[in-house]
Amino acid sequence: MAAAGGGGAGAAGGGKVSFKIILTSDPKLPFKVFSVPEAAPFTAVLKFAAEEFKVPPQTSAIITNDGVGINPQQSAGNVFLKHGSELRLIPRDRVGALAAPF
């Protein structure tokens, strides 16, 4: 019975999960590690990760190391349990897109 918004670490639903997110569009494969509340919406994690890597969040997706897409309409805790902590960020505008003329 943890209070909503309480900072109690280890309380059910009040813990944190960490993700190592790798930017796949960069040949050097840079990564960042984020620690977020389990109950955080994964859409917020996706948006934050994209902004940290300076790529547009509206056209980005997160996949597993096996290439499986992740539905962002779930909590960060669910994603962590289903897919683990190591994920990849892909700016979707680079996947199969033609270069736009200037």
Curated annotation (Swiss-Prot):
Gene Ontology CC, one term: cytoplasm
Covalent cross-link Glycyl lysine isopeptide (Gly-Lys) (interchain with K-? in acceptor proteins) as placed by the record, residue numbers: 96
CDD domains, per the entry: Ubl_UFM1 (cd01766)
Domain of life (superkingdom): Eukaryota
Entry keyword annotation includes tRNA processing: no
Removed propeptide positions: 97-102
Any one GO BP annotation for this protein: protein ufmylation
Cross-referenced InterPro entries: Ubiquitin-like_domsf, UFM1
A Pfam family recorded for this sequence: Ufm1
Transmembrane segments: none
Keyword annotations from UniProtKB, A to Z: Isopeptide bond, Ubl conjugation pathway
Family classification: Belongs to the UFM1 family.
Protein task: Ubiquitin-like modifier protein which binds to a number of as yet unidentified target proteins.
Name of the featured protein: Ubiquitin-fold modifier 1
Species this protein is from: Oryza sativa subsp. japonica (Rice)
